[in-house]
Amino acid sequence: MWLKQLSLLHFKNYTESTLEFSPATNAFTGYNGAGKTNLLDAIHYLSLCKSYFNPIDSQHIKKGEDWFMVQGLFEKTVDVADSISCSLKKNQKKQFRKNKKDYPRLADHIGQYPLVMITPNDVGIILDGSEERRKFIDNVISQTDNRYLDTLIQYNRIILQRNQFLKSAAASRQLDLGLLEIFNSQLVEVGNQIFAKRKAFMQEFSPFFKKHYDYISDHAEMVELHYESPLLHDTFAHLLETNQDKDRALERTSQGIHKDDLNFSIHEGMPLKKFGSQGQQKSFLIALKLAQYSFFKEKKGFSPLLLLDDIFDKLDDKRTKKIMQMVSDDAFGQIFVTDTDADRISQIFQDIGKPIRIFDVKEGAANEKI
């Protein structure tokens, strides 16, 4: 699968632009703020129905305009190509179409054109709270299992209802134990399904991660990745039962898979967040995302798109070259990369003997360099 063509109308800082891509590696080069990352975000829209950076769709309409449209032509086989479009008018619902037909639900599109994106913002997976790491797990599983996304939505809805019930009980000083048991039963059923899928996913995912990190670092340091969940140590039903008084006092659900986390460590168990250098943290993140790529490829049977935004920052030349050698291998599919230095990216690919198509980006316009 690869993206053959991308067209933008009134999207972010682009008025109108159409680009024809290589099925191998494509680079967007130019100064910061020119619009390189906006092109990656447009591709992300076509894959996942939303921006990678900003969930408010209306803020992606070009200043002074009333709407935007992003269109792409995906080629899955030599004989099969799909036209995907996303459009939005101010104060109206977002429209998402495949071959000019609307999707009944946006969730039906997720996973059809899988994508992995690596950006400087991803450092939040390491430095921020557990919610960011759960989002990472859920994003990966959702692109390979549509039912997982539905189950996750259902779980979040029940948690919200249970928390509202606990708040009402605190206000009235009356607790309906029968209704609480219904919420608990629903939560246990759905939560156990999510826990089982997350646990199975991590067992498959971890070997991919280790392989990629060892390659990038050339076995320079030992890192570990562990899945943490309250359900690893007790049943969900028992956790809810034993924490009932605590939940009443807090007026929220204190235990469950919404407390799951990933533990990242380096140097035999030291927290990566505190003891990893910026280069080691970036190598860890890239290995995570490349493991996501390998997981998608195994599950889907074809290569997803790989988007690399400003990945050279904070990496030494050796690790940079190893990453580019890896992703430009025939085992990988189509790649999009941004860099402020056209000569640098051109030289890297010349050194490893791989073709690359370079687009010069200036003030919301992108043109192929000949």
What are these regions (language model features)?
Residues 103, 107-115, 119-185, 189, ...:
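A conserved P-loop NTPase coupling/switch region
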Residues 36:
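Conserved lysine of the Walker
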Residues 45-57, 291-299:
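Post-Walker A helix-loop "phosphate-sensing" segment adjacent to the P-loop in P-loop NTPases
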Residues 72, 334-341:
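Structural recognition of the conserved hydrophobic beta-strand(s) that form the central parallel beta-sheet
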Residues 309-311:
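Walker B catalytic acidic pair
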Residues 1-31, 174-305, 314, 318, ...:
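Conserved NTPase motor "head" modules and their coupling/switch loops across ABC/AAA+ ATPases, GTPases
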Residues 48-126, 130-132, 141-144, 148, ...:
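Nucleotide-state sensing region of NTPase/ATPase domains
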